[in-house]
């Protein structure tokens, strides 16, 4: 399942939004970064749509994530309860700090959503969390790991993806 991103204007500079599609084709391409001490990565073993919704709303509010804002409970449940989806949560000092969703299809794994709660941005967690997401994606027997980001996301999002080893394979306006 792929979610269509709607056209938006970049409120930071009033330019049309740009979307970058990035990929990694081999696990060895990962330039990993360790998570700092006092962090724990937890897989959501029991589908909990409200948890995914919470992270989507709280992480996405700073970056104008809108594609799921109008989802019904049934849409959330249908998304989260699929075998192809894994949700992972980052705990920092025992407190939820971020998450990522891995969506597997056709031998590829998409990092569908990834991010930190606002309180935890700037604490050195992003590179380690992204590295963990990529490692978990490769662990799903992926032949390719991919992600997309846009000019509305965190100003360092694209740099983080590239620093971890992702390569841009397509750039387009939204």
For each predicted feature, which ranges?
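Acyl-donor-binding surface of acyltransferase catalytic domains
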Residues: 1-45
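Active-site/acyl-donor-binding loops of N-acyltransferases
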Residues: 20-25, 162-174
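Short amphipathic alpha-helix that is part of the acyltransferase structural core
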Residues: 34-68
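A conserved beta-strand-loop-helix scaffold within acyl/acetyltransferase catalytic domains
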Residues: 71, 80-87, 91-109, 113-118
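Short acidic/polar active-site loop segments enriched in Thr and Asp
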Residues: 86, 143, 167
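Conserved acetyl-CoA-binding loop-helix of GNAT-fold acetyltransferases
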Residues: 116, 122-137, 158-163
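Conserved beta-strand-loop-alpha-helix junction that forms the acyl-donor binding cleft
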Residues: 121, 147-157, 169, 174
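Conserved GNAT acetyl-CoA-binding A-motif
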Residues: 137-149
